[in-house]
UniProtKB/Swiss-Prot annotation:
4Fe-4S recorded as keyword: yes
EC number(s) recorded for this UniProt protein: 7.1.1.-
Organism: Aethionema grandiflorum (Persian stone-cress)
Coiled-coil regions listed: none
GO molecular function: 4 iron, 4 sulfur cluster binding; iron ion binding; NADH dehydrogenase (ubiquinone) activity; quinone binding
Named cofactor requirement(s): [4Fe-4S] cluster
Membrane topology, as annotated: Peripheral membrane protein
The name this protein goes by in its record: NAD(P)H-quinone oxidoreductase subunit K, chloroplastic
Signal peptide per UniProt: none
Length: 229
């Protein structure tokens, strides 16, 4: 039985009949089935990868690493998030099914870290792009700290209310080269052929109207090697 305390689930009758609610039952079933998305951009991910070994054995918490965002409900943003990587991170988050959770792992993810000083290409805080449930500071955090963050997230899940599990649909955060973040329309348009337009050299901001533009299909090689910051 899970050690997380449930106010209603813990009330039992003399005949050992458990009385509970839909909220507690749903939360209890998800506590031991968090499937994290393997997402790492820097050295913090090495500490997270060490949890898979037998020394820390994070399988005991029911964590099953997934390579597809459509099969994951937890993402640990481990490492530096660059401006060019930001749209991909937002898209991965949008492809995850609800309810979903985010753990910001490391100083570079939370504030930009040492790369945030006079840097034009680093996002200064992943919470400007996606909502964060647990902040895990460190450079890098130890595996024990990651386990503690997961424990705190499990405690938060145990206290959730069913109607609050589905977050309201929000506009995504658009970014500019001078670190001004704007709210734009959703990037999950269902069109796999859309191409990201980077700002021209004559301006420092990405227009909210031309953030995404539908163009003729392009190869992934051309898309990756397109000009930009």
């Amino acid at each position: 039985m899970n050690s997380i305390k449930f106010p209603v689930l813990d009330r039992t009758t003399k005949n050992s009949v458990i009385s509970t609610t839909l909220n507690d039952l749903s939360n209890w079933s998800r506590l031991s089935s968090l499937w994290p998305l393997l997402y790492g951009t820097s050295c913090c991910f090495i500490e997270f990868a060490s949890l898979i070994g037998s020394r820390f054995d994070f399988d005991r918490y029911g964590l099953v690493p997934r390579s597809s965002p459509r099969q994951a409900d937890l993402i640990l943003t481990a490492g530096t998030v660059t401006m060019k990587m930001a749209p991909s991170l937002v898209r991965l988050y949008e492809q995850m099914p609800e309810p979903k959770y985010v753990i910001a792992m490391g100083a570079c993810t939370i504030t930009g870290g040492m790369f945030s000083t006079d840097s034009y290409s680093t996002v200064r805080g992943v919470d400007k792009l996606i909502p964060v449930d647990v902040y895990l500071p460190g450079c890098p955090p130890k595996p024990e700290a990651v386990i503690d963050a997961i424990t705190k997230l499990r405690t938060k899940i145990a206290r959730e209310i069913y109607k609050d599990q589905i977050r309201p649909q929000q506009g995504n955060r658009c970014f500019t080269t001078n670190h001004k973040f704007l709210i734009v329309r959703s990037t999950d348009t269902g069109n796999s052929d859309q191409e990201l337009l980077y700002p021209p050299s004559s301006t420092s901001e990405i227009s909210t109207e031309t953030f995404f533009k539908y163009k003729s299909p392009v190869s992934s090689h051309e898309l990756v090697n397109s000009g930009g910051v």
